[in-house]
């Protein structure tokens, strides 16, 4: 078992084993995010799903109202006039078969891949490369579309795709540790609502098991899901 650093031991000591009210959890997380760089903030949702079954798998998108704090590199696979549309809309990489070949040969310098439906038969052969990295375009994720300008703008502005892992946990980044408390709370609420809105049809019993927030170099803090679910935010949050 890896030994904790003195810094981590001190931070763990500041987090009590309890359910925290959402804003209180965010305030504490900001206090313990003391690395020498701006840490990324994530939420981990442990759900009562069995990913072995298709009707219990979760894959959806969330638009963070206060952005991600990251500069997202968007790649687009399309052809013809759509290439100009994608470039004009701000895509970082655009191409057809040649971009597919580059990706197959190891090019992965992008965070999001969008494809037009007519290119999906060719994109399908990239499944082994893109699938494990969560980059495979999908209609559910909003990354298979002819409306390239809208999709590019949405993802650049803070739209994220998320899915459960093999153990039924969903991991979603929801900002940076230097965001205001209100901005992080608004983003966290958006994630909770998106997970609830896209509840898989095959789920039986309790859907939410636990929800934790953490930053890159901090211990995790458990949030009271019921309080988060019932939270009403003002329009400017």
Curated annotation (Swiss-Prot):
One of its GO terms (molecular function) is structural constituent of ribosome. It comes from the Eukaryota. Coiled coil: none annotated. It is found in: Plastid, Cyanelle. Its main location: plastid. Pfam families: Ribosomal_L1 (PF00687). GO terms for cellular component: cyanelle; large ribosomal subunit. One of its GO terms (biological process) is translation. HAMAP family: Ribosomal_uL1_B. Belongs to the universal ribosomal protein uL1 family. Part of the 50S ribosomal subunit. This is Large ribosomal subunit protein uL1c. It comes from Cyanophora paradoxa. The gene is rpl1.
């Amino acid at each position: 078992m890896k030994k904790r650093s003195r810094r981590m031991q001190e931070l763990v000591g500041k987090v009590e084993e309890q359910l925290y009210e959402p804003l209180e959890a965010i305030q504490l997380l900001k206090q313990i995010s003391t690395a020498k760089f701006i840490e990324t903030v994530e939420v981990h949702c442990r759900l009562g799903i069995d990913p072995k079954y298709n009707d219990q798998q979760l894959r959806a998108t969330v638009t963070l109202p206060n952005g991600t704090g990251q500069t997202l590199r968007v790649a687009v696979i399309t052809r013809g006039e759509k290439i100009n549309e994608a470039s004009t809309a701000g895509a970082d990489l655009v191409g057809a078969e040649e971009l597919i070949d580059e990706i197959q040969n190891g090019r992965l310098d992008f965070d999001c891949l969008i494809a037009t439906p007519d290119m999906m038969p060719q994109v399908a052969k990239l499944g082994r490369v893109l699938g494990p990295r969560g980059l495979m375009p999908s209609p559910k994720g909003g990354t298979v579309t002819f409306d390239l300008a809208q999709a590019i703008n949405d993802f650049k502005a803070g739209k994220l795709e998320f899915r459960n892992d093999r153990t039924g946990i969903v991991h979603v980044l929801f900002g940076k540790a230097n965001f205001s408390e209100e901005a992080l709370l608004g983003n966290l609420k958006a994630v909770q609502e998106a997970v609830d809105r896209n509840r898989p049809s095959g789920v039986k019993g309790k859907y939410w098991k636990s929800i934790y927030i953490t930053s890159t170099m901090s211990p995790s803090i458990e949030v009271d899901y019921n309080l988060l679910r019932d939270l009403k935010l003002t329009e400017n949050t």
